[in-house]
């Protein structure tokens, strides 16, 4: 069984019987939005009996990879049944990050279970038992997440991150969401988005903002520095950490993120609602724009 991402691989490993081999295309720590398949990935596809993918335009490279492999085995979109959040800025661009709500993650698990039962029906009983145990863990973790977020002061329940991967998360657990980048990490940084974040931090006492594991943290670090706001920690969304890291599994990703967010947003804010002197403010914007230009040039060179 071949999963496109590390979190889908982990979900499958928790449900599949021990006799089933689960592998992933996008390695741990790597961004599936901008992943570039390798020749070894073609071989993985050729060896697979089943491919589990997120869908919702997360893996825009998958069809081309399958075409290159020449093998057209069974492909299952595990987000099937999710009512996606639509992107207001672009048509036909649903938010793919539905796994960031554990209740929707149960749909992923159910679709994975069904695909495994169809692949190896003789092991249906074991698959069903493992699935039920996993669902119970997800339900328990979901309730803990709800309780934990409620312990954050209400005025602090504002989550500012690198890219827009936490809309399902915020909707499920009661957080107001803002980000510098859009739904995909290959989007360009927009000046207006940076200014909105800066204005938000000037007008409200938000104690922390958060970087993400698969995205260059420089821009958010500069914004935090300019507004005397803490970096609350590193969150995981599009990929799991390595096995020795803080988010080696889908469920531990949630435990880590909730704990990190609660700790960061429960702290006393060191920001002041008064504006910085104009000279300092414009110097800050200049530094931010310089970082944006550097990131754009790096991306352009990579594409070239």
Question: Model regions: which residues?
Answer:
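Extracytoplasmic metal-acquisition and chelation regions
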Residues: 1-304
């Amino acid at each position: 069984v071949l999963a496109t991402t590390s979190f889908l691989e982990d979900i499958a490993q928790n449900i599949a019987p021990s006799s089933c081999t689960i592998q992933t295309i996008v390695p741990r720590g790597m961004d599936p939005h901008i992943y570039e398949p390798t020749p070894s990935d073609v071989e993985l596809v050729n060896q697979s009996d089943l491919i589990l993918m997120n869908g919702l335009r997360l893996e825009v490279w998958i069809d081309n990879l399958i075409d290159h492999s020449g093998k057209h085995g069974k492909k299952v979109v595990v987000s099937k049944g999710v009512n996606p959040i639509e992107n207001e800025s672009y048509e036909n661009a649903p938010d793919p990050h539905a796994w960031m709500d554990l209740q929707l993650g149960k749909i992923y698990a159910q679709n994975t279970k069904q695909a495994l039962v169809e692949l190896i029906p003789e092991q249906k009983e074991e698959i069903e038992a493992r699935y039920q145990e996993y669902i119970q863990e997800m339900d328990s973790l979901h309730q803990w997440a709800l309780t934990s977020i409620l312990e954050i002061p209400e005025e602090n329940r504002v989550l500012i991150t690198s890219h827009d991967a936490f809309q399902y998360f915020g909707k499920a657990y009661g957080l107001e969401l803002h980000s510098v980048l859009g739904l995909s990490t290959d989007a360009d940084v927009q000046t207006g988005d940076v200014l909105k974040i800066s204005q938000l931090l000037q007008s409200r006492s938000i104690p922390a903002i958060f970087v993400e594991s698969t995205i260059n943290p420089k821009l958010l670090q500069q914004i935090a520095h300019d507004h005397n706001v803490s970096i609350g920690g590193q969150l995981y969304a599009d990929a799991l950490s390595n096995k020795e890291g803080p988010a080696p599994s889908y469920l531990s990703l949630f435990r880590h993120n909730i704990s990190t967010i609660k700790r960061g947003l429960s702290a006393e804010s060191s920001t002041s609602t008064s504006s910085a002197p104009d000279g300092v403010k414009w110097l800050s914007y200049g530094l931010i724009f310089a970082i944006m230009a550097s990131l754009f040039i790096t991306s352009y060179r990579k594409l070239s």
